[in-house]
């Protein structure tokens, strides 16, 4: 996941193919072949580089965690125009394989219908790709959307498909680490009502102690206040590695 288009040195994403090839090759070195652009769409150089390297990309509309997604006519028109432009702009890139309407969207009745209509619009324009109403839409509480081509979430209603949650919940926090935990039972339950691809959402969200030496790497426009605060608290508790 390329989280939130955060580029601390420049404040904007790389704009050239060589820069993107360098970044994507780093992903590949970690065994990654699929990149989700969290609530944003990167510039065309990203898609061109991914085409050359055989990487797969999932852009998203720039919509994140509202309580009433697409609830107004103005927002619906705006995001529909964004969707149409995105599909027209990137349609010829084979690396562009999936798309969602945004991150952790929630909506009221009218917004829900507009979410369905946006997915239908995308399918009509270009049926060669996979579309979904969101990544972790409704935080998984409403289950799989039957009109979406795939489902990405932390859970499907009360069926958990992620190892850790906020508040120190999840089996990674509650049980001794082991490699014998699978999601077979969870998927068997989901398959009773949904047969399309299922992805677990943001599985790497667990607490680790930061590498505070990275503070010396910030030379651009960003001030890593969060890391500085964490370091201060770690020092106060006598936990700073020596």
What positions do the PLM features span?
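Substrate-binding clefts and catalytic carboxylate motifs of secreted carbohydrate-active enzymes
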Residues: 99, 163-242
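Polar, glycine-rich mid-to-C-terminal structural blocks
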Residues: 111-187
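Active-site flanking residues adjacent to catalytic metal/cofactor-binding acidic residues
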Residues: 59, 103, 201
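Solvent-exposed loop/turn segments at secondary-structure junctions
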Residues: 41-43, 63-66, 103-107, 137-139, ...
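Active-site-adjacent substrate/metal-binding segments within catalytic domains
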Residues: 1-66, 72-98, 112, 235-242
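Aromatic- and acidic-residue-enriched segments that line the glycan-binding/catalytic groove
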Residues: 47-58, 70-84, 114, 120, ...
């Amino acid at each position: 996941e390329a989280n939130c288009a955060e580029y601390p040195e420049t404040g904007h994403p790389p704009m050239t193919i060589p820069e993107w090839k360098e970044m994507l090759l780093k992903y590949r070195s970690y065994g990654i072949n699929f990149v989700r652009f969290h609530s944003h769409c990167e510039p065309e150089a990203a898609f061109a580089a991914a085409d050359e390297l055989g990487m797969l990309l999932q852009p998203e509309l720039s919509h994140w965690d509202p309580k009433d997604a697409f609830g107004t006519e103005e927002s619906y028109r705006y995001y529909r125009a964004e969707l149409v432009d995105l599909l027209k702009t990137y349609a010829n890139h084979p690396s562009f394989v999936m798309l969602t309407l945004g991150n952790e969207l929630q909506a009221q009745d009218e917004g829900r219908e507009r979410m369905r209509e946006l997915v239908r619009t995308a399918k009509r324009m270009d049926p060669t790709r996979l579309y979904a109403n969101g990544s972790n839409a409704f935080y998984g509480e409403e289950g799989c959307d039957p009109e979406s081509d795939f489902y990405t979430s932390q859970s499907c209603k009360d069926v958990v498909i992620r190892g850790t949650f906020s508040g120190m919940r999840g089996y990674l926090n509650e049980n001794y680490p082991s490699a014998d935990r699978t999601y077979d039972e969870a998927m068997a339950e989901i398959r009773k009502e949904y047969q399309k691809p299922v992805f677990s959402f943001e599985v790497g969200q667990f607490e680790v102690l930061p590498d505070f030496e990275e503070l010396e790497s910030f030379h651009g426009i960003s001030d890593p206040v969060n890391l500085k605060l964490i370091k201060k608290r770690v020092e106060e508790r006598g936990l700073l590695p020596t």
